[in-house]
Each structure stands twice: as structure tokens, then as C-alpha cells.
């Protein structure tokens, strides 16, 4: 019955087409994979979520708050900040969404003809919080200077840094000896500079 209606031939054609399609798909996938693997690791990492270093000592050194009116720009810059922190060796957590600030204004449509009709305006400020852990102040300042240099338009930043000092810090600063003869006020600085100029040989030539 199968040979009479030609079902065996149809089955053969279907299997041949399927195997050819599979080979073509495998070849295309291999070519795309070769091109994908040829990318540098730094570019390859952009297709994945940013990596994070584990927090070991739980020493909070800074809080970075990002603000913007657009969620897309805010999330993009938060992603960029996480990648910068990873390559600088800073353990970071976040971004944590903070409550959205909503502001509304009601104004008249026009000063004369439409003075009795009102118009409402609303603005939403979205926020994200990033926390930096287990890093020294120099690395944190480098991180902040880099993201400030490459900041995005429309995204604001606010950073709170935390440094731990001893209880006797004021006493230790008071005990630091000052340089002998160092001027302490602006007038003393100017006077010392004038005295230095008057003693110079170039100035004495004109006297």
C-alpha cells in the first residue's frame, strides 16, 4: 500500500529536506558562533548582566544615588556604574529602586482669554541606590571621577562617603607639629612672598 500511494517517497523527501535544513542551520550557527567568539571579552560581557564581586567584610564605604526622569537612561547608567565598580575591584550591591518622587503643578492656560481654565503638569523623578563596600577612599574617588567624566545627560548623582576614624582623632590632629616658620594667615603669606622678592638679586638691581 505504501508503494502504491508513494508515501515512502514522500517520507524520503521530507527526511532529506529536514537533514539539509538542519545542516544549514548548524552551519549558520557555527558561523555566528565563530563571529561571536572573535569579540574581545570586554565586548562579549556587554551581552550579559554586569558581574559583581562578593562582599566579604561588610564595610560600607559609600552610597551612590542616581536620579533621572527616564527609567531607561537611569537603568543604563546604573548598569555602567556596576561594570566600572567590578573592573576597579569594588564590591557593589544594587541597583535598589527607591520611591519615585511625584510633583504636580496647576497653572492657568493663558493670562487673559483662558484664565479661568486650568492645566495640570506632572513630573516623576526615579531613583536607584548603589552601595559600595570594602574599598579604600582612593579607589572610591577614582570610581566617582570616572563615572562623572563619562556621565549621561539627564542622570544626576549624589554620593555619601563614609570613613572610619579613631575616637581620639581630634587630639591626634592637635598633637601634629606644624612646620617651623610656616605662615598661618593670608597676610603672613603675602608678607613672606614680598620679603622673598626684595631679597632676590633681580629686585636689588633696580634699587
Swiss-Prot record:
Sorted keywords for this record are: Mitochondrion, Ribonucleoprotein, Ribosomal protein, Transit peptide
- An example molecular function term from Gene Ontology annotations: structural constituent of ribosome
Name the record gives this protein: Small ribosomal subunit protein uS10m
Keyword Methyltransferase annotated: no
Q: Read off the Gene3D superfamilies from this record.
A: Ribosomal protein S10 domain (3.30.70.600)
Listed SMART domains: Ribosomal_S10 (SM01403)
NCBIfam families registered for this protein in UniProt: rpsJ_bact (TIGR01049)
UniProt-listed GO biological process terms: translation
Amino acid at each position: 500500500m505504501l508503494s502504491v500511494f508513494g508515501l515512502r517517497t514522500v517520507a524520503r523527501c521530507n527526511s532529506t529536506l529536514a537533514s539539509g535544513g538542519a545542516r544549514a542551520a548548524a552551519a549558520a550557527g557555527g558561523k555566528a558562533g565563530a563571529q561571536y567568539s572573535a569579540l574581545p571579552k570586554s565586548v562579549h560581557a556587554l551581552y550579559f548582566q554586569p558581574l559583581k564581586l562578593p562582599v566579604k567584610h561588610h564595610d560600607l564605604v559609600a552610597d551612590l544615588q542616581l536620579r533621572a526622569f527616564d527609567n531607561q537612561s537611569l537603568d543604563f547608567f546604573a548598569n555602567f556604574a556596576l561594570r566600572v565598580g567590578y573592573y576597579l575591584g569594588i564590591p557593589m550591591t544594587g541597583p535598589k529602586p527607591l520611591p519615585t518622587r511625584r510633583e504636580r503643578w496647576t497653572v492657568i492656560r493663558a493670562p487673559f482669554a483662558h484664565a479661568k481654565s486650568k492645566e495640570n503638569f506632572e513630573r516623576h523623578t526615579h531613583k536607584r541606590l548603589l552601595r559600595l563596600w570594602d574599598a579604600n577612599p582612593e579607589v572610591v574617588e577614582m570610581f566617582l571621577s570616572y563615572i562623572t567624566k563619562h556621565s549621561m545627560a539627564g542622570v544626576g548623582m549624589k554620593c555619601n562617603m563614609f570613613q572610619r576614624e579613631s575616637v581620639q582623632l581630634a587630639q591626634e590632629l592637635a598633637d601634629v607639629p606644624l612646620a617651623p616658620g610656616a605662615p598661618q594667615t593670608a597676610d603672613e603669606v603675602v608678607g613672606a612672598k614680598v620679603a622673598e622678592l626684595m631679597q632676590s638679586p633681580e629686585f636689588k638691581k633696580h634699587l
